[in-house]
């Protein structure tokens, strides 16, 4: 007999974390047995989601996208580290505004280095919300790579400097070094391991070649060209038309040098339009300003659809087995939601077990037919209760509880008055 309800939402951007959404929905369901599994698609909010499901938060002081120190977190459990690029190198880490030509992914590399030094055997890298278009150069430098110009000088931060790239030396990756200058802090969810402050160039005891890397991303853009990292995403990071051309040239140079010095990477052709083949042309290479390319080419990462991989990490299939209903959602259910974002991934996973799915959202702009084709039988929007979007953003919690009560009435009447056997727990 089907028993519990699985609550598996993504965040409501700018209002509530995924865990907060799940808690509000659970409260609105009353005595219905629930299991809360906050989810994410690999973008911002990924660390929060996996911490809510039992991973330990590790907080570290690292280098922000413009060089300022920032406190960023990753999540760890049983030799697996989940690193979210937006934590260290995201747009929200730009207090002085965009820096499209000079922003760096160095801090993300420092998070990875810290995780490896503290025992991570697998690193899941969530890409999304990045401030930089540096092709992952900063991340590689933080991990010990040397990116040199023709005079043997280390390149400064940022995508513009890549135009002068002559050599990429990753020999340190196999030498058991995990570089970094980060400083570790205590965490409310648990301490990392009691080693205190991690200054300088630490030693992981093994090379990065011994670490498995997975890129969790739903972005399918290549590195270069009209659908590449610079053309599509750098304008969102403050790049004007001239900046886009500079960044495209830098990424093309990175791909060319990588192809020349690391033959398996691929090659670049110039025939009026820059075309990348090999790794640079793979779907996802353009994710997060080209960090996807660096992970594929130099860390030998695998790319996995973000929501699918994270649902596996959180053992969603096991938790949804025997459920009466799954409630998913995100801030806006729109056309983007139909292209592989978290609610669709949750719906697809639930469908394998024959469990119906409904969604909560702040607002929606897709039809009932589109929802049903995506595996979601019904959607409940905050704007159904409060047409003022600003009020919905400011006070979403009580509205979510009211939506959950409607869901209980519409779909869960056999549970009326029953005791919450799952105790509102999290996965």
Show where each model-derived region lies.
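N-terminal loops that bind phosphate or other acidic moieties
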Residues: 1-185, 189-427
């Amino acid at each position: 007999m089907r028993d519990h309800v699985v609550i598996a939402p993504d965040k409501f951007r700018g209002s509530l974390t995924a865990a907060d959404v799940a808690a509000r929905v659970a409260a609105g369901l009353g005595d219905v047995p629930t299991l809360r599994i906050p989810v994410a698609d690999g973008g911002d909010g990924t660390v929060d989601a996996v911490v809510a499901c039992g991973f330990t938060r590790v907080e570290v002081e690292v280098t922000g996208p413009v060089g300022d120190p920032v406190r960023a977190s990753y999540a760890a459990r049983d030799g697996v580290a989940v690193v979210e690029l937006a934590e260290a190198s995201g747009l929200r880490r730009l207090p002085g505004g965009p820096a499209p030509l000079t922003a760096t992914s160095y801090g993300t590399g420092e998070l990875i280095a810290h995780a490896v030094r503290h025992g991570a055997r697998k690193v899941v890298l969530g890409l999304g919300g990045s401030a930089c278009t540096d092709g992952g150069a900063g991340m590689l430098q933080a991990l010990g790579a040397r990116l040199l110009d023709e005079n043997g000088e280390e390149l400064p931060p940022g995508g513009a400097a890549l135009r002068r790239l002559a050599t990429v030396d990753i020999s340190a990756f196999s030498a058991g070094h995990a570089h970094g200058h980060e400083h570790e802090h205590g965490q409310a969810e648990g301490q990392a391991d009691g080693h205190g402050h991690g200054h300088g160039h630490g030693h992981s005891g093994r090379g990065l070649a011994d670490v498995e890397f997975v890129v969790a991303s739903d972005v399918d853009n290549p590195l270069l060209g009209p659908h590449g990292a610079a053309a599509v995403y750098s304008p969102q990071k403050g790049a004007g038309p001239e900046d886009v051309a500079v960044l495209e040239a830098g990424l093309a140079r990175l791909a060319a040098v990588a192809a020349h010095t690391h033959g398996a990477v691929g090659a670049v052709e110039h025939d009026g339009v820059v075309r990348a083949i090999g790794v640079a042309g793979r779907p996802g290479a353009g994710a997060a300003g080209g960090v996807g390319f660096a992970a594929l080419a130099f860390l030998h990462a695998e790319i996995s659809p973000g929501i699918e991989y994270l649902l596996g990490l959180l053992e969603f299939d096991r938790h949804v087995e025997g459920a009466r209903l799954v409630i998913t959602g995100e801030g806006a259910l729109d056309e983007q939601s139909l292209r592989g974002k978290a609610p669709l991934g949750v719906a697809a996973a639930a469908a394998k077990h024959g469990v119906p799915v409904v969604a909560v959202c702040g607002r929606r702009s897709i039809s009932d037919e589109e929802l049903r084709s995506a595996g979601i039988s019904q959607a409940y929007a905050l704007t159904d209760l409060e047409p003022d979007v600003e009020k919905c953003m400011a006070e979403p919690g009580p509205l979510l509880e009211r939506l959950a009560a409607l869901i209980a009435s519409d779909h869960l009447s056999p549970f009326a008055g029953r005791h919450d056997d799952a105790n509102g727990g999290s996965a």
